């Protein structure tokens, strides 16, 4: 039996999650903010009309997306018939909401689009590709389901995922880590692990059997750096448009002007380099259909790829009479990022115009390209999620 077949068997035996589903939905599941997914994944576009939840399990993410987008058509798919049956039971209990279409289907199947349909504005795939041997196959299949200008949210394990160290440690006690077998012995060892580790992963010893069977004792794990995930995505025509930790990581570097050695890396390369220095345990990534490096802010403006205001930040302006400059204080409550920059009067005017219009007109970048410092500032804003590079001219504007 292949690792892929064992993974399927594991989730068919123990659908996940099966407890406190209503509470998980109330908390938004594990999905990032829709506003962020839209701002960096689909800049300048209206709310998604069709959403695919790829690898939906028992339906938590699908129910979350319906709550966020009550008018959208939502399709959810999973390879486990038991998981889909569980989700359908919960769906039948819902009242007064637009129905979700639940399907049984294998994301590794080249014909998955025949099962779920196409023309999706947004696809979410959370906690799925970390457990499949060939994630690039799924990434390629999902691209076939996407509408022009659509985006893919990907939630996957990082290099610092607790299981990276935990599994070899459990194996050193003679415990089988490719399948959940000795659950009592496993929980005893996890109790010791919990006592010695405070890595933010919670009390593993108290986790459900379905969680342990997938995230601790499973047949296959891709606990990869962001650079490796990006490489997998680049191979099949995706580029990283942002990650949920990039703004905070980049701001930490910028506070001491250590970000300068990274200039002029595009958002994808920038996020990968910072993750190498400060590995994440889990990646929340927005992907767009674009060649590697195509979303770099250095390629934006002047009739090529438009630059968009993301709306993730509030900005407060104050005049500095002595220096003849304007101080702009940026604040993003969602990511707890705050910083300030000194702008020229001309830069302040064009920034205000961008904030009002939402998209930069032709010639907008000239105020920044006049100096090396201006170019670096615009690049920094792209990494921090203040602005986002749009689709190439002629790429289509549906949705």
Regions picked out by a protein language model, each given a short descriptive name:
Residues 153-192:
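Conserved class I S-adenosyl-L-methionine
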Residues 271-354, 375, 379, 383, ...:
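Acidic, low-complexity/disordered tracts enriched in E/D and polar residues
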Residues 13, 23-47:
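Conserved alpha-helix/loop element of class I SAM-dependent methyltransferases that forms part
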Residues 136-148:
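A short glycine-rich, Lys/Arg-flanked "PGG" loop and its adjoining helix->strand segment in the class I
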Residues 179-261:
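Substrate-binding/catalytic lobe of Class I Rossmann-like enzymes that use SAM or dcSAM, i.e.
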Residues 50-52, 60-109:
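Class I SAM-dependent methyltransferase SAM/SAH-binding core
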Residues 121-134:
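A short SAM/SAH-binding and catalytic strip from SAM-dependent methyltransferases
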Residues 112-123:
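A short acidic, Gly/Pro-enriched loop at the edge of an enzyme's catalytic core
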């Amino acid at each position: 039996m292949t690792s892929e077949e064992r993974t399927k068997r594991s989730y068919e035996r123990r659908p996940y999650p099966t407890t406190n589903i209503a509470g998980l939905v109330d908390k938004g599941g594990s999905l990032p903010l829709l506003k962020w997914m839209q701002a960096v994944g689909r800049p300048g576009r209206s709310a998604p009309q069709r959403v695919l939840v790829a690898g939906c399990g028992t339906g938590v993410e699908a129910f979350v997306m319906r709550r966020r987008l009550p008018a959208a058509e939502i399709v959810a798919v999973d390879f486990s018939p038991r998981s889909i049956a569980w989700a359908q039971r919960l769906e039948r209990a819902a009242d007064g909401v637009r129905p979700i279409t639940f399907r049984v289907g294998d994301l590794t199947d080249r014909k998955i689009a025949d099962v779920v349909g196409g023309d999706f504005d947004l696809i979410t795939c959370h906690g799925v590709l970390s457990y499949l041997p060939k994630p690039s196959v799924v990434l390629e299949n999902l691209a076939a389901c996407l509408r022009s200008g659509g985006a893919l949210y990907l939630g996957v394990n990082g290099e610092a995922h607790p299981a990276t160290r935990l599994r070899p440690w459990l194996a050193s006690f003679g415990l089988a880590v490719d399948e959940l077998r000795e659950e009592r012995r496993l929980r005893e060892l996890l109790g010791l692990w919990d006592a010695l580790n405070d890595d933010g992963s919670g009390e593993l010893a108290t986790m459900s059997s379905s969680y342990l069977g997938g995230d601790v004792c499973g047949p296959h794990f891709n606990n990869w750096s962001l650079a490796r995930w990006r490489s997998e995505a680049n191979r099949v025509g995706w580029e990283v448009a942002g990650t949920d930790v990039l703004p905070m990581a980049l701001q930490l570097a910028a506070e001491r002007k250590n970000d300068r050695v990274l200039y002029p890396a595009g958002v994808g390369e920038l996020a990968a380099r910072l993750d190498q220095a400060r590995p994440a345990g889990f990646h929340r990534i927005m992907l767009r259909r674009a060649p590697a490096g195509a979303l770099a802010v250095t390629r934006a403006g002047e009739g090529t790829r438009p630059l968009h205001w993301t709306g993730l930040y509030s900005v407060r302006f104050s005049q500095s009479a002595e220096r003849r400059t304007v101080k702009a204080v940026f604040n993003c409550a969602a990511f707890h990022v705050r910083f300030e920059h000194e702008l020229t009067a001309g830069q302040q005017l064009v920034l205000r115009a961008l904030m009002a219009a939402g998209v930069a007109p032709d010639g907008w970048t000239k105020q920044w390209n006049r100096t090396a410092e201006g170019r670096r500032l615009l690049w920094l804003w792209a990494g921090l999620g203040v602005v986002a590079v749009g689709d190439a001219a002629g790429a289509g504007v549906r949705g």
